[in-house]
Amino acid sequence: MTCRKQTILMCGLIGILSAGTSAAWAIDVKLSSEDAHKALETGRLPMEKANSPEDVKKVLQQASLATRVGADPETDPCGASAVLRTKRYRLEAFGRQEAAESKKRNTEIRMPEEFIKKVMDMPNMEIEVQLCGDDEYFAEGALIELQQGSKRIKAIDIGKAERGRKNETNGPAYRSRFTALFAYEQFDPNAASVFVVNLQDGKEIRVPAEFSKVK
């Protein structure tokens, strides 16, 4: 085999592997029953090993970081961020609940299949946006859309923002959060994206979201 042919072959293999990696880490819109039960196990096992309230806290913090986009609350507590409650996120949460209830009742507890199927069939992804502002009601009436290149995707529903809580760290005086729903069929689960929040005072807040790194 010539050097040129070897180079072409290697490039082809790298391209295939890269494409496979991207697809594996994109937001999963469709899950098989096997995938769903693996997600339950992924959530269940760390909680089974958690033997103290501090261990449980660490498990829950790690779970929220896995699908969080935008600012890292550990290093930037008042930076805007969003937790993407994907299908895998919800199933892993079910798994943690299974482990917690099993310990509490001292018997094995498992989620009914109809609950699991309901998550698998969910048409929308819920996100929870967390941000800071200058007064208690700064997030009231906030609007949000998802931008992917030139495409603009509107939220199909936006929850009422929480009344701001006093911010004990540096930055704006209050922190708040709200939820929004986006239809899976309307966005690309692999694309680099930005959630754009528009507040009633005219301020725009952008939360970058690399979907290819979220399950």
How does the language model describe each region?
Residues M10-G20:
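Bacterial N-terminal signal peptides
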Residues T2-C3, A19-A26:
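Conserved, well-structured beta-alpha core segment at the onset of a catalytic domain
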Residues W25-S193, V197-K215:
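Conserved functional micro-motifs across diverse proteins
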Residues T2-C11:
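Bacterial N-terminal signal peptides that target proteins for export
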